[in-house]
Design a protein with these regions (language model features):
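Rossmann-like NAD(P)(H) cofactor-binding subdomain of soluble oxidoreductases
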Residues: 1-81
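Electropositive phosphate-/nucleotide-binding environments in soluble metabolic enzymes
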Residues: 4, 26, 49, 100, ...
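Internal alpha-helical scaffold of NAD(P)-dependent oxidoreductase catalytic cores
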Residues: 34-35, 58-63, 78-130, 135, ...
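Glycine-rich beta-alpha junction loops
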Residues: 47-49, 68-73, 96, 123-127, ...
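NAD(P)-dependent Rossmann-like dehydrogenase/reductase catalytic/cofactor-binding core
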Residues: 162-254
């Protein structure tokens, strides 16, 4: 059975892991603030590149341990399915790459938990590389409504993916993070079905709102801040927002 506590009952935990959908993060900040005390470490395993700053702005960045999770899953209703044998798991580390006592404490906890994990001395680059992967592989698929095989079988789908990723790489460089040498994403047709659908398309299929604000929305804001054009991500944001409105019945006239 699950052990569920109110924020007040959980006050002062050693480690708090934040794993909510992006649209629910702002609404979770009050609870996070109530749980955290002076010694609490907070890990956000959410996608995107700004959840740590959003949380840290409320509770103080000294609490934050940068982290991300790599897991291929499929959500149906309230059920999430994944293959633990091929799941990479949690990556975490200090922003400065140091192997601090906090890193050692989390490692000690995870060693006894069965959680798959990796300690990273370059966690910010890993977070941005995953961000580029999500934008370049999640969004074209969601716009076109195709399985993963579209990237292999259509030069046009792959071109959209490449142009979206190029914008992420340019913004990352402006922020001070170089992901140019990160390998392009691909898939092994022997182990991954060309019918596979990533989370944004899964959300649209189920008529749920997506996390496109966390992907292209944040990139547009950062691009504007640093003077980097992001036209492909601007179009992707508009298209996916329009698909959300269509799913909501706002203009579906069939």
């Amino acid at each position: 059975s699950l052990c569920v506590k109110t924020p007040q009952e959980a006050k002062g935990v050693d480690l708090l892991i934040v794993a909510v959908k992006y649209g629910s993060l702002e609404g979770s900040l009050d609870a996070i603030e109530q749980i955290v005390d002076d010694e609490t470490i907070v890990m956000s395993v959410m996608n995107g590149v700004d959840s740590e700053e959003i949380i840290g702005h409320r509770i103080g960045m000294q609490h934050m341990m940068y982290s991300m999770i790599k897991i291929a899953s499929e959500r149906t209703g309230n059920c999430v399915r994944f293959n633990p044998e091929v799941t990479e798991g949690v990556y975490f580390g200090e922003a400065d790459g140091s192997l601090s006592w906090r890193v050692a404490a989390i490692e000690n906890l995870f060693n006894d938990s069965g959680v798959r994990f990796h300690i990273s001395e370059d966690i910010l680059k890993k977070i941005w590389a995953k961000y580029a992967l999500n934008i370049s592989m999640n969004l074209p698929q969601a716009i076109i409504g195709c399985g993963l095989g579209g990237y292999r079988d259509s030069a046009y789908v792959m071109d959209i993916s490449t142009k979206l990723k190029d914008e992420v790489v340019a913004v990352a460089l402006a922020v001070g993070i170089d992901i140019r040498e990160e390998k392009a994403a691909g898939f092994d047709s022997r182990t991954v079905s060309p019918k596979a659908r990533f989370s944004t398309l899964q959300d649209l299929d189920a008529k749920r709102h997506t996390e496109v604000d966390m992907f292209s929305g944040v990139l547009l804001r950062l691009g504007k801040q640093f003077g980097i054009p992001t036209p492909y991500n601007a179009l992707a944001l508009d298209i996916i927002k329009a698909l959300e409105e269509k799913n909501d019945g706002r203009f579906d006239y069939q």
